[in-house]
């Protein structure tokens, strides 16, 4: 647990467990805190959960570990001796508590996925090597996790592996959802997509989003009355066109 020096008594709510370690150090914000937390990570993969985020159930880590091991074994068979294991991001779906619905991630990460909507960091398990050269770029106040995901895909050539399961529960009403930060998010999104996709491709995708009524679809996805219906349709579309690693294979 990385704490920035909270005084609201939240640390006292942690259960007594020898596996929990608390590191307290001042930080300048969410992404700076996450960068600091990386210095304490000792495993092969890392996931970030922020205030209000929870693993969906007690079996998430066990099921994901099984998928990771199968993928590692298959990769080892194909990569041969002397080759480093491929850097990967394993990701799944998110349950949005405020909307009362599952937010399904795209089963395939391509250029359009990277423009439109990548998986949120709460449902991603990153190979720690993807943070070896650099962490989150804190100049991005709202979109640093988005920028880092594109860095992993385009600069580090990481493989994104979709696992069909709900990984994390998101409380809703978070940092990125305020009106001011939504405006900042749009500006940062334009800068980041131009950098990784190029101006022409980013413009084509922006026009495509407008032609397919993206603003209306966003309102449907965020409306408590229609969110479950909309995301259910999206899940069916994803199921027909994507590939996945099943946790129960």
Model-derived segments and spans:
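Solvent-exposed, non-transmembrane amphipathic alpha-helical segments
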Residues: 57, 146, 150-151, 183, ...
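Catalytic core of nucleotide-sugar-dependent glycosyltransferases
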Residues: 165-166, 178-204
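Weak global preference for isoleucine
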Residues: 20-22, 30, 89, 103, ...
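Nucleotide-sugar donor-binding/catalytic module of glycosyltransferases
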Residues: 1-178
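Membrane-proximal basic amphipathic "stem/tether" segments
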Residues: 194-249
